[in-house]
């Protein structure tokens, strides 16, 4: 019985070339893993008109939902609920302002069709997912504020992290600066943010410990402030766009929230129109 010849053995020169190629590929992969993330471009300044438009849009949306004003925790006598089919295009516009809608549009198109057909399932229109962050994102986008300066998102925590990161990297030009909720008196255009979790953070600096993980939050847009009160408009508040009148002291500083209410953790100072070459100082 004769032995069958095996496959030809690679030459030493070929083996060396293969080893060198493998080593080069490994170094390339390691280099790619170690490459630093690109530094984002600095944010651009905006004219005062951007903040003014932001406030006009927030106020107009609030009026379209019935112009309801409540104190924290209070329920209004009447409100135009999100489940009213007449409000379908309003909330749809908010969701169209975020890059990922979490399936909200597809789900609620089906519920809208059910409501039009008299199907009881239509009563759940716009109940899920929560749309408060989409509302804030819509106001910013409609005011002409680009995603670089305000990256709208379906989750408040995502854009909160982006604003905190911008303030750390570009403190001189960041359009929004995080402040402690009781360190400053809020002004129109600022964002007032609260933690809705069971173990809430009490200061925006504590957010770093989450390392980007989702945290239930809610942010409102301050539209009026003065001695004794801070008025802020938010979406998905009592199933509508609602204006909440938060108590403040004689100097306009927020008073601590009542027990059981979401915990304030930040006021994001709005610097649109307040950075060079613009120097507007009025509200």
Predicted regions and their residues:
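Short, solvent-exposed loop/turn and secondary-structure capping segments
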Residues: 70-73, 150-152, 204-205, 243-245
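N-terminal capping segments
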Residues: 37-150
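Short loop/turn segments at secondary-structure transitions that flank enzyme active sites
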Residues: 64, 139-142, 146, 198-200, ...
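C-terminal motif of bacterial Sec signal peptides marking the signal peptidase cleavage site
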Residues: 30-32
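...with weaker cross-activation on analogous glycine-rich loops/strands in unrelated enzymes
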Residues: 152-238
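Low-complexity, Gly/Ser/Thr/Pro-rich intrinsically disordered linker/tail segments
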Residues: 231, 236-283
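Bacterial N-terminal signal peptides that target proteins for export
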Residues: 2-22
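Residue-level signal for mature regions of secreted extracellular proteins and peptides
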Residues: 26-27
